[in-house]
Amino acid sequence: IATQVDCSEHPKPACTLDYRPICGSDSKTYSNKCDFCNAVMDSNGTLTLSHFGKC
């Protein structure tokens, strides 16, 4: 099981509408890697991956 997501290409100005949910350490479900990685960048790295799938 992967415990990290590679956010090196983020943040991005726009994300696709793909639905591949990721649960963040803030107990929020992000709709895909792009949404999650943008939030990670906004949090200055304090947000981490909890698990793949809905929270």
From Swiss-Prot:
Q: Which GO terms describe its molecular function?
A: serine-type endopeptidase inhibitor activity
- Alphabetized Pfam families for the sequence: Kazal_1 (PF00050)
Q: What are the annotated GO cellular component locations?
A: extracellular region
- PROSITE patterns this protein is in? KAZAL_1 (PS00282), KAZAL_2 (PS51465)
Where found? Secreted
| InterPro entries for this protein | Bifunctional_prot_inhibitor, Kazal_dom, Kazal_dom_sf, Prot_inh_Kazal-m
Q: List the disulfide bonds.
A: C7-C37, C15-C34, C23-C55
Q: Spell out the protein name for this chain.
A: Ovomucoid
Q: Which species is this record about?
A: Dacelo novaeguineae
Q: Record's domain comment?
A: Avian ovomucoid consists of three homologous, tandem Kazal family inhibitory domains.
Q: Where is this site: Reactive bond 3?
A: L17, D18
Does this entry carry the keyword Glycoprotein? yes
List UniProt keywords, sorted A-Z: Disulfide bond, Glycoprotein, Protease inhibitor, Repeat, Secreted, Serine protease inhibitor
Glycosylated residues (UniProt): N44
Q: Which ranges carry the Kazal-like domain? A: 5-55
